[in-house]
């Protein structure tokens, strides 16, 4: 079941990739993918290229894929290990969701962080208290790690 579903998603992704994103298997292992997200234009991540890993569980799509950033990023919902705090990757997962939709959700998280459910409270505090400083640091990290 999982393998057929993953193959279908790969075909769909290659045919109609989501804006600013790409993804595909690492070598021959269809359960392990690498994804790329271009920093959205209306964000401090503009111009950056961010790499992520996607690991599919054997019971996919009934369980969500494990998605993590391998590129360092300054963001309240993404920690230094690359873990992403995003409801659809946890409690709000549904088998109707796809890798494409997950990548688009991560893109919109880059544009609109959720400081009220942070993985990195210090960054969330900066985001809420001093948006200019947050944007400056996010831009600096993008230039340092994603360009």
UniProtKB/Swiss-Prot annotation:
Coiled coil: none annotated. The keyword Cell cycle does not apply. One of its GO terms (cellular component) is nucleus. The keyword Protease does not apply. CDD domains: UBCc_UBE2D. Pathway: Protein modification; protein ubiquitination. Keywords: ATP-binding, Nucleotide-binding, Transferase, Ubl conjugation pathway. Its EC number is 2.3.2.23. It is an enzyme of class 2 (transferase). The active site is at 85 (glycyl thioester intermediate). Residues 1-147 form the UBC core domain. PANTHER family: UBIQUITIN-CONJUGATING ENZYME E2. Accepts ubiquitin from the E1 complex and catalyzes its covalent attachment to other proteins. In vitro able to promote polyubiquitination using all 7 ubiquitin Lys residues, but may prefer 'Lys-11' and 'Lys-48'-linked polyubiquitination. Belongs to the ubiquitin-conjugating enzyme family. This is Ubiquitin-conjugating enzyme E2 D4. It comes from Homo sapiens. The gene is UBE2D4.
